[in-house]
């Protein structure tokens, strides 16, 4: 009965996240320990230098194959990691990302695992790795010139249409039915990918109703007025027979946008680009580059407080007023924080001192990287993976810096812990050790990392 109650506790996504974090961290930090994720019945498939794919089995052969590929000379950038429950309570994990070598060449790859259950967790039964060919999927979107005509800008993008009722006369109720989020799409900044060096402005031509010009429609999202001011305009329109005069007088800048609609392709790019940014001052797609002197601290205890972080990091330099944030997600099993220093020297000192002890954890200090798609200036939603040795662009993948624990990780998202019964790779480790079901992680084996969570190492 105990086993039946414990088995459904960790979901496939929890198991997948914990495994991916530990696997890639150890793969690039301590590749000589990766074979402990496998057993003699496991199969591992890898391409060689010629592109031919070979499959090996047994822990010794798997260890030899992994060591021959020199993973310590690469860094992994994980883009996606998906997991599903499979046969006999197993878990399938599909990972995509990029490997960057010492020559700074980035290669896209795909890797799939089948995690088979065992008494103390899971082990890798199947492992298939493939490099993928880069395809210019978004090339057309990138090549769209900002200074082109409206027809050229429309080509690669199909935005939401502005719904305007084509009535012979403008009535208050049809105008009031225009939703604000639809009007926001009249001029929107489009970011096709992280790698684009610029933005593409999408200006949607509108077939206006009677008595409403292009200038008046496009001027609604311009200026510094908040969205709710447009609602007040709609209220005035209900009581006024000439609502268009209010829109046109309040917005002084429709002319540049109108010129862009009729301008030839040789129009300079500066004016429409600036106009687009003014049109959408609150757009969540605009990247914020300046983060001051901030650091990102992961693997914090769940009960961490800003005061606790201040006691540790004030030793490295002056901290800005209210410059400390602590966030946690107990459901996903992680806690992290941000610290903003007054000077770059304080930030650099904290980075060099990583890892630091906070509570009962070895917290890892990294430079705060902003790629806000809806995050604003406060660190925002860190919903995208970022590059690093075995690190990930999703907070649920933040883990420790352990140099590789001994054994495996628990089904509840615990540590890569436990000791193998022999150093000989043929004898194998004990697999991933089961830990308490609350995902908090028990005390791990010996390694260079901290404790708890779904992590790559035990306490030192």
Swiss-Prot record:
Interacts with MBD6. Induction: Probably regulated by the microRNA MAV8. Residues 15-131 form the NTF2 domain. It holds the Pfam family RRM_1. This is Nuclear transport factor 2. Keywords: Cytoplasm, Nucleus, RNA-binding, RNA-mediated gene silencing. GO terms for biological process: regulatory ncRNA-mediated gene silencing. It comes from Arabidopsis thaliana. It is found in: Cytoplasm; Nucleus. It comes from the Eukaryota. GO terms for molecular function: mRNA binding. Residues 383-394 have a biased composition (Low complexity). Residues 207-226, 238-289, 361-460 are annotated as: Disordered. Signal peptide: none annotated. Involved in RNA-directed DNA methylation (RdDM). SMART domains: RRM. Disruption phenotype: Reduced DNA methylation in some of the targets of RNA-directed DNA methylation (RdDM). Residues 293-370 form the RRM domain. SUPFAM superfamilies: NTF2-like (SSF54427), RNA-binding domain, RBD (SSF54928). Residues 373-382, 399-416, 450-460 have a biased composition (Gly residues). One of its GO terms (cellular component) is cytoplasm.
């Amino acid at each position: 009965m105990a086993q039946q109650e414990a088995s459904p506790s960790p979901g496939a996504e929890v198991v997948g996240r914990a495994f991916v974090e530990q696997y890639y961290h150890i793969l690039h930090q301590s590749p000589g320990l990766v074979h402990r994720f496998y057993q003699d019945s496991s199969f591992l498939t890898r391409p060689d230098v010629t592109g031919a794919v070979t499959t090996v089995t047994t822990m010794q052969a798997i260890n030899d194959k992994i060591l021959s590929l020199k993973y310590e000379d690469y860094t992994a950038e994980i883009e996606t990691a998906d997991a599903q429950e499979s046969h006999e309570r197993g878990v399938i994990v599909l990972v995509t990302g990029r490997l960057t070598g010492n020559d700074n060449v980035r290669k896209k790859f795909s890797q799939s695992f089948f995690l088979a259950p065992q008494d103390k967790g899971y082990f890798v039964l199947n492992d298939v790795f493939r490099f993928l060919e880069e395809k210019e999927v978004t090339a057309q979107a990138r090549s769209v010139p900002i200074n082109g005509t409206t027809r050229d800008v429309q080509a690669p993008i199909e935005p939401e249409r502005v719904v305007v009722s084509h009535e012979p006369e403008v009535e208050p109720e049809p105008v009031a039915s225009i939703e604000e989020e639809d009007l926001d799409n009249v001029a929107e900044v489009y970011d096709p990918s992280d790698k684009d060096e610029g933005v593409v402005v999408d200006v949607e031509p509108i077939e206006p109703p009677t008595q409403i010009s292009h200038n008046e429609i496009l001027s609604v999202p311009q200026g510094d007025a908040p969205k709710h001011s447009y609602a007040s305009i709609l209220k005035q329109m209900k009581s006024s027979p000439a609502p268009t005069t209010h829109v046109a007088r309040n917005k002084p800048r429709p002319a540049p946008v109108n010129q862009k609609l009729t301008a030839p392709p040789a129009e300079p790019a500066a004016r429409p680009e600036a106009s687009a940014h003014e049109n959408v001052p609150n757009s969540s797609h605009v990247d914020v580059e300046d983060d001051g002197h901030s650091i990102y601290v992961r693997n914090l205890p769940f009960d961490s407080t800003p005061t606790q972080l201040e006691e540790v990091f004030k030793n490295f330099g002056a901290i800005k007023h209210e410059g400390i944030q602590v966030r946690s997600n107990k459901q996903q099993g992680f806690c992290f924080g941000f610290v903003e220093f007054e000077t770059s020297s304080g930030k650099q000192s904290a980075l060099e001192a990583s890892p630091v002890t906070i509570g009962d954890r070895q917290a890892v200090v990294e430079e705060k990287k902003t790629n806000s798609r809806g995050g604003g200036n406060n660190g925002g939603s860190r919903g995208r993976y970022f590059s690093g040795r075995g690190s990930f662009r999703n907070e649920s993948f933040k883990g420790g810096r352990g140099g590789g624990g001994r054994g495996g990780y628990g089904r509840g998202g615990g540590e890569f812990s436990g000791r193998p019964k022999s150093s000989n790779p043929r004898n194998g480790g004990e697999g991933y050790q089961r830990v308490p079901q609350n995902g908090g992680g028990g005390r791990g084996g010996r390694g260079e990392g901290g404790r708890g969570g779904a992590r790559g190492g035990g306490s030192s």
